[in-house]
């Protein structure tokens, strides 16, 4: 079972989501994958919408008491998704998700010379722990 941690920026376009997230997943049998994602707008919410009718094997990680977003679960596989919350920071949540995964799917569009995005930090952590890039 591949455990795929999905990370990405909030300001991604639909076209970039398709190109950098959906296209790489096409080489996998989704029945052999489990997904671990956050609850932020952008990649997380787009991935929830993409996966809600494709898999029950998804865990949403969130800071605080409840997720900021959850896909409609009426007559979808999302009704079986797991939710793990109570993290005190995005960093704590991301480390937890990275520790759980065997693979990762992440692309950074926001880092520049002044700022390293959380997505890039997650990519670096995954590589440092020898996680497999999707």
Language-model region placement:
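Short, hydrophobic/glycine-enriched beta-strand segments
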Residues: 2-10, 37-38
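Short, Lys/Arg-enriched, disordered terminal segments
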Residues: 1-2, 134
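Acidic/glycine-enriched connector segments
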Residues: 12-134
